[in-house]
Amino acid sequence: MYHNSSQKRHWTFSSEEQLARLRADANRKFRCKAVANGKVLPNDPVFLEPHEEMTLCKYYEKRLLEFCSVFKPAMPRSVVGTACMYFKRFYLNNSVMEYHPRIIMLTCAFLACKVDEFNVSSPQFVGNLRESPLGQEKALEQILEYELLLIQQLNFHLIVHNPYRPFEGFLIDLKTRYPILENPEILRKTADDFLNRIALTDAYLLYTPSQIALTAILSSASRAGITMESYLSESLMLKENRTCLSQLLDIMKSMRNLVKKYEPPRSEEVAVLKQKLERCHSAELALNVITKKRKGYEDDDYVSKKSKHEEEEWTDDDLVESL
């Protein structure tokens, strides 16, 4: 259960400010490592600022969701949610300048398939990359190389509680204990849209799965012009606990505000930041502190050592077959 989980104890935070501090600290720690190797100065413009890292994380998180949405065989929502949570957690304590988000996002999806027991083979997984067989083999090698690192950086807390199960539970509860609403299924589509949008925010790191699920349902009801105050007060027995009800309403308002204020990264900005990111991962700077036998995922234009044939490196454009 969530309330006894590592997610509640270690990965649910008190505020957006706390998340910002963790990310800024990860950025600072990497800068210190990079300066210590003597190749850059403390204020070198090669470094990404914390807000620039966040923009890139938003971009790659969206790419992760797009990759999962067209995955074949169809990926269950719980697996997608788990992969998304892994990605968010990883970059709370790590910098994109040290670990490239392109390979981390794929490793998150790969690990989520295993943990959530979505039976897909390694060749099937990389087969979803728009790449040659050699390129797919290269991608799989990189994923396997980073899998243990990801597990370690998640502190071996691999079980993720997503809002999808409580969401279905609330719909069942509405059907059985709230006859005022004749057909609760009319709320599903808009609520699903809300869940998709809130997955792009930090809500998973701030609120419980049941709070997110309930907010999705009530937001859907509100958009449909359906009042559900009596469901909260009577069915959820919050009538006598006005403090708890008030806190719940405040939480829901905060979540809706998260969705409203979310701004997708602009393509022009992302293009500039990706150039800075690739420079951080370039061989001449070698800011990545684990540059052991790299296969070139850091550079979109990388071509592996040529012998009898040339092998083309996979890039961001190879992540999905179609968007």
UniProtKB/Swiss-Prot annotation:
Instruction: Please give the biological process terms from Gene Ontology that the record holds.
Output: protein stabilization; regulation of G1/S transition of mitotic cell cycle; regulation of transcription by RNA polymerase II; transcription initiation at RNA polymerase II promoter
Compartments where found:
Nucleus
Keyword tRNA processing (UniProt): no
GO MF term (any one): cyclin-dependent protein serine/threonine kinase regulator activity
Q: Which Gene3D superfamilies match?
A: Cyclin-like (1.10.472.10)
Q: Which residues carry this modification: Phosphoserine?
A: 5, 132, 304, 322
Region (Disordered) residue ranges read 297-323
Sorted alphabetically, the Gene Ontology cellular component annotations on this record are: CAK-ERCC2 complex; cyclin-dependent protein kinase holoenzyme complex; male germ cell nucleus; nucleoplasm; nucleus; transcription factor TFIIH core complex; transcription factor TFIIH holo complex; transcription factor TFIIK complex
Q: Where is the composition biased (Basic and acidic residues)?
A: 302-311
Q: Where on the tree of life does the source sit, at the highest rank? A: Eukaryota
| Keywords of the record | Cell cycle, Cyclin, Nucleus, Phosphoprotein, Transcription, Transcription regulation
Q: What is its main location?
A: nucleus
Q: Where is the composition biased (Acidic residues)?
A: 312-323
What InterPro entries does the record point to? Cyclin-like_dom (IPR013763), Cyclin-like_sf (IPR036915), Cyclin/Ssn8 (IPR043198), Cyclin_C_2 (IPR031658), Cyclin_N (IPR006671), CyclinH/Ccl1 (IPR027081)
Residues with the modification Phosphothreonine, per the entry, are 315
Q: PANTHER family, alphabetically?
A: CYCLIN (PTHR10026)
The family annotation for this protein states:
Belongs to the cyclin family. Cyclin C subfamily.
Fill in the subunit field for this protein. Associates primarily with CDK7 and MAT1 to form the CAK complex. CAK can further associate with the core-TFIIH to form the TFIIH basal transcription factor.
| Role of this protein | Regulates CDK7, the catalytic subunit of the CDK-activating kinase (CAK) enzymatic complex. CAK activates the cyclin-associated kinases CDK1, CDK2, CDK4 and CDK6 by threonine phosphorylation. CAK complexed to the core-TFIIH basal transcription factor activates RNA polymerase II by serine phosphorylation of the repetitive C-terminal domain (CTD) of its large subunit (POLR2A), allowing its escape from the promoter and elongation of the transcripts. Involved in cell cycle control and in RNA transcription by RNA polymerase II. Its expression and activity are constant throughout the cell cycle.
- Know the name of this protein? Cyclin-H
